[in-house]
Amino acid sequence: MSNFQRRDFLTGAAAFAAATTATLVGTRRAVADDKPPQPIRGKEGAPIIDPTNPTREAQNVDRLVPPSTDHGTMPNLRFSFADVHNRLQPGGWARQVTGRELQVAQALNCVNMRLKAGAVREMHWHVPDEWGFVLKGRMRITAVDGEGHAFQDDISEGNIWNFPGGIPHSLQGLEGDGCEFLLVFNDGNFNEDATFLVTDFLAHIPKEVLAKNFGVPESAFANIPKEELYIFESQVPGPLDADRVVGAGPVPSTYSHKLMDQKPIETNGGRVRIVDSSNFPAAKMIAAALVEV
């Protein structure tokens, strides 16, 4: 890019940023003055007569008053967790946005989940990979691969994990207020309510088969749940070292990554941390960037 082109680009970008900021500030001021935004841009548009939802319209100004550069049919590029059904369970909840709610999200599915201290998202597995980001609190993640390698780790706000598809795993909130986190699956049509759960699996296997497999009497399975638990309350676990299971040894690649310990790329406008399979080998299907502006 020549100096002239670069100068023009920077000047245009600055003007665009200033105009965008002015629009947002004006909208906030209008809402604060009990003057809801209207679908008017210069000589185009007209005031809303009815129906109207000023609060929602103020949150979606670029949909109500789209930029003049928009052209043709514009798909919805965002969807709020506040608008989806929430699954309430003893010890927590879960809500998801999939390709059903957000049509452009055919490659990714997102779940927002909350676990109280001690509460467990029971051991389960599914076809797509699971990439997780801790929003608040602390949690313990546990998994075992097909070779019997066991994995346990305690992670906190800003940390991430990735379980490859088919790997059985569980999640548990730790002391304090438990945890809240975001899950991402590399399948937009994946359904969090349709995972394979260990309680559901055990409930549909004859007890004599379970007894022979685990080498215990059938009576050991007399009180197993008759249906899935999904999320259930439990006690806060003890220290991580005391909870570790040796199994066949550690997994080949760790399933957790301390993202906030990663040195960020610093710029004049903020910083960014990028995580992909080059610095987190377990995350072969999903890459991400944490951007601070």
Feature locations, PLM:
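Mobile, glycine-rich extracellular loop/lid and propeptide segments
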Residues: E122, W131-F133, G158
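Short beta-strand segments in beta-sandwich/barrel cores
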Residues: V111, V120-R121, G137-A143, A288
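N-terminal secretory signal peptides and thylakoid transit peptides that target proteins
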Residues: M1-A17
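A short, N-terminal "cap"/entry segment at the start of jelly-roll beta-barrel domains
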Residues: V31-A107, L210-E292
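Glycine- and acidic-residue-biased ligand/ion/polar-headgroup-sensing regions
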Residues: V127-G146
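Ligand-binding loop in jelly-roll beta-barrel domains
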Residues: G165-E192
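Histidine-centered metal-chelating micro-motifs
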Residues: A119-E122, R140, I160-W161, G165-S170
